[in-house]
């Protein structure tokens, strides 16, 4: 089983939002790619499934955690999960995401934890050396993630997969960025059915209009 996790969000006591809790487009694209490939997966949206709840932020008293608790997220992970993908686009979300990953790794020590998103792409060296992440997907991830799943399940070499970074005997290995997909029509549509999209919409937490593989028009 493949489990995809969108971590909880971060807020301050002043009400300032560290990152607006929009629907996670990157994970939705990954879910769409898995769906088209016929692979079994589940999505846990740690923010969207409980947008109205806030909890103490681990290790700090000036921030709050928005969404599901770590325990609630972990309780939703199927026991047969062998691959757990976590998204983290913004570095402001990394401290919370890192703690979540540590707890997930402790509960599922045999599962491979894969990080995607801009934060991991930018600082994969730090992520791999200072967290429980097993593999970082660099840049566009839809095709790379599928290749990675196949290699992990077939126990074949990861060095032949473009677009990832990992540690092998404490040696950092990065295979470079994969080639960008030029034709957007070849990309699987985001699987929004796996996300609590109505929860976002009802609270006016929505994305802008995307006309390509770029920042949305707001």
Can you describe what each PLM-predicted range is?
Residues 1-2, 40, 213-216:
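Residues that mark the start of a beta-strand
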Residues 33-183:
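Glycine-rich beta-alpha loop elements in corrinoid/cobalamin-binding modules
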Residues 10, 181, 193-195:
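Active-site/binding-pocket entry motifs
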Residues 20-35:
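Short catalytic helix/loop segments, enriched in acidic residues and glycine
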Residues 24, 161, 213-214:
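A structure-centric signal for secondary-structure junctions around beta-strands
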Residues 2-21, 112:
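Short glycine-rich His-centered loop
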Residues 19-23, 90-93:
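Aromatic-acidic/polar surface patches that form glycan- and anion
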Residues 185-186, 190-218:
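Radical SAM [4Fe-4S] cluster-binding motif and immediate context
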């Amino acid at each position: 089983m493949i489990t995809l996790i969108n971590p909880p969000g971060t807020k301050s006591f002043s009400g300032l939002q560290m990152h607006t809790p929009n629907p996670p487009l990157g994970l939705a694209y990954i879910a769409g790619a898995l769906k088209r490939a016929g692979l079994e997966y589940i999505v846990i949206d740690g923010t969207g499934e409980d947008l109205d709840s806030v909890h103490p932020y681990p290790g700090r008293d000036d921030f709050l955690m928005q969404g599901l608790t770590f325990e609630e997220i972990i309780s939703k992970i199927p026991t047969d999960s062998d691959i757990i993908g976590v998204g983290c686009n913004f570095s402001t979300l990394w401290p919370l995401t890192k703690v979540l990953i540590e707890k997930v790794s402790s509960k599922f020590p045999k599962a491979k934890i894969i990080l995607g998103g801009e934060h991991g792409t930018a600082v994969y060296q730090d992520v791999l050396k200072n967290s429980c992440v097993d593999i970082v997907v660099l840049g566009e991830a839809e095709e790379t993630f599928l290749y990675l799943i196949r290699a992990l399940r077939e126990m074949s070499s990861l060095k032949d997969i473009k677009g990832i970074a990992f540690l092998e005997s404490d040696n950092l290995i990065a295979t470079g960025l994969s080639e960008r997909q030029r034709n957007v029509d070849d990309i699987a549509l985001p699987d929004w059915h796996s996300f609590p999209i109505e929860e976002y919409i009802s609270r006016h937490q929505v994305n802008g209009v995307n006309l390509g593989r770029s920042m949305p028009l707001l």
